[in-house]
Amino acid sequence: MNVSSKTAALAATAAVVVVVGISAAVTLVPHETDRFAACRKGTGSASAQIGGPFTLISETGATVTDRDVITKPSLVYFGYSYCPDVCPIDSTRNAAAVDLLAERGHDVTPVFISVDAARDTPPVLTEFTDLMSPKMIGLTGTPEQIDAAVKAYRAYYLIRNPGDPATLVDHSTQTYLMDPKLGFLDFYDRDATPEMVADSVGCFLDALQTPGDTPAAGNGN
C-alpha cells in the first residue's frame, strides 16, 4: 500500500471513528422527559458530551471564547478555506439553511472553525466566510487551540503533507447544532439538504419556546 492509499485508509477509518464517537456520546433518555423528542433523528433524546469551552481567533483578529461566539443557536462546522469542494458545499448548505430559518423567523448563526492554522489567517477566513454568508463567523487559532476545539466536539482532522502549501486536509464533516444554554442539540451529515437542516433546527427552536427540562449537553457554558 502506497503512502496516499495509507492516508486515505486512515482518513476513512477516522471518519467512522468520529461518527461512532458522536453516537457513543449521546445518551438516550425516555421521550416523556424530552421536549425535543419529535425533533431528533433517533428514538430517544440526547444528552451528549459534545462541545465545550474553546479559545480561538476570530476572522477579525480578536481572541474569542465559546461564550463570545455561541450567543444564539448556531450551526458549527469544522473545515478549511482551501478545501476544494467539501467545505464550500457544506458551508453553502449551512448558509442556505440559515437563510430559510430567517424567513421563518429564527435567528441562527453559522460558525466555521478552521482546522488549517497555517493557511487560514483571519484575512483569508474573512474572504471565505463573506462568500458563504454575511452571518457566518470564521474562527482559526494556533494548532493547540484548534486541537482543543476539535477534541471538545469529537471532530477529526489530518493534514496530509504538513509544510506543503498546497496540502489537502482530511476532516470530519458533521455540522453541530449548538444552543448557548443547552449546548449540543443534534448534528447533521453531508446528505442533509438545506430544507432538512432548516426543518430540524426549526423544530428544536420551536420546542425551546415550550417550558421543560431537557438534560444540558455539556458545552461548558
From Swiss-Prot:
Signal peptide: none annotated. Pfam families: SCO1-SenC (PF02630). The keyword Metal-binding applies. CDD domains: SCO. GO terms for molecular function: metal ion binding. Residues 45-210 form the Thioredoxin domain. One of its GO terms (biological process) is positive regulation of cytochrome-c oxidase activity. PROSITE patterns: THIOREDOXIN_2. Keywords: Copper, Metal-binding, Photosynthesis. Cu cation binds at residues 83, 87, 171. The keyword Metal-binding applies. Involved in both aerobic respiration and photosynthesis gene expression. Belongs to the SCO1/2 family. This is Protein SenC. It comes from Rhodobacter capsulatus (strain ATCC BAA-309 / NBRC 16581 / SB1003).
